[in-house]
Amino acid sequence: MGSRKHKCAEIYKESRKSRYVARLNNNPTSPRKTRLMANAIRGLDVDKALGILQYSHRESAPKLRKLLLSAMANWQVKNTGKVMEESELYIKMICVNGGRQLKRLRTAPQGRGYRVRKRSNHVILELGSRVEERTATTESNDVENK
């Protein structure tokens, strides 16, 4: 590997250490229905989002709750020795994209057939820490003031 690629790979590795991401692929619900729950929890603190997902009756709520718990576990692995409550975790980004569609045929009157699209989706959830962002902004302000 060339030196330029090696440097870029090292920079990429360092940036991945500070990202806390969980992915859910091929979730068998329609993206539109999942986006309703994703929009409800976007930008909220982790504890508040868990409460909303736990008591919601929507089909995608338990899956998103499990995904959020997975992202929290990823944060815990990368930050051993830190307390989750002190870091003020929140949902920085949640993205629901369309996945693979299963196309089925449903019989219709007069010898016709209607196409049924069974949709799926992919969900990407990223956590952020309000404490880390506050310290980063104060450090950047200190550098600008000098």
Annotate the PLM regions.
Residues 2-25, 29, 36, 40, ...:
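Structured, basic alpha/beta domains of bacterial-type, RNA-associated proteins
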